[in-house]
Amino acid sequence: MAPRSVTPAVLLALALLGAACGSGSEDGLRVVTLGDSVAYDADPGIRAALEAITTGVGSGVEVETRSFGGIGLLRPGFDDYLAEVLDTQPDVVTLMLGGWDSDKAMADPESYRTRVDEVTRRIIDTGTFLVWLGLPPTPPEEDAREHLILVNDLISSVAGRHRNVAYIDGSLLGDARGEFTRTNIAVDGTVQQVRKVRNGEDDGHLCPAGAALLGEAVAEVLLIRGVVGVEVGDPEAGHPQGEWWTGEWTLDPRYDDPPGACSG
């Protein structure tokens, strides 16, 4: 079943792309994840989900995670950062950005839309498929809702104009109304903490259960793209850590930064 965060138009575009691409090459599918500190927390979950997939030729998916804090489309060094990635000729790039750009995006939305389109074209013109990850809801105390909605709307509108681009709505980490929530229904159907706690207050960064939800959404998009094999999460996937959402990656030190962040 397709995730609720993927629009029907995107699913149709991905299905058409999958028909053109077939089942992948003998070298497997190469994916690079890019983004800021929230994406950094998402990276292990995305990698675990994707590496639990086998392609049609059984060669699997290789994921390189390259997210780090403080990066944005308008931040110094972004173009060089992107160039380094594209030089490796990935098949797929995932991109979650915008938090560090929000003030300038609010000041001049059309200029930011142009920048999003420029970066999008730069990626897909190399033959790479792009998955934009929308920014997830932020805690009300951060007073960033208006900024987040604007940035996500600009990115999703650009994504919708390009055939080889998918947009995944970050509200999949939210509650039934798409608003911030510390806990949510996890991949395995249980209620788990998906967002961090910092100094006793809600924080926008991710816990393993939140990272796994994003990983599942990306994996399902790429399955529709034409990566065939077992469905993500199936125990028969042959993932070395068993059920991918409970693997060793969930013990990564980033999920205990600050200490106790994901046990509150």
Residue positions per predicted region:
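Catalytic His-Asp segment of secreted/periplasmic serine-dependent ester chemistry enzymes
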Residues: 140-264
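Conserved SGNH/GDSL esterase-like catalytic core that processes O-acyl groups on lipids
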Residues: 28-114, 241-264
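Bacterial N-terminal signal peptides that target proteins for export
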Residues: 1-10
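Extracytoplasmic/secreted cell-surface and envelope-processing proteins
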Residues: 41-42, 101-109, 139-146, 176-179
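Extracytoplasmic/secreted proteins, especially bacterial periplasmic and envelope-associated proteins
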Residues: 33, 41, 45, 80, ...
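C-terminal motif of bacterial Sec signal peptides marking the signal peptidase cleavage site
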Residues: 17-20
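Active-site segments of SGNH/GDSL-like serine hydrolases
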Residues: 99-100, 121-152, 171-172
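Bacterial signal peptide processing site
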Residues: 22-24
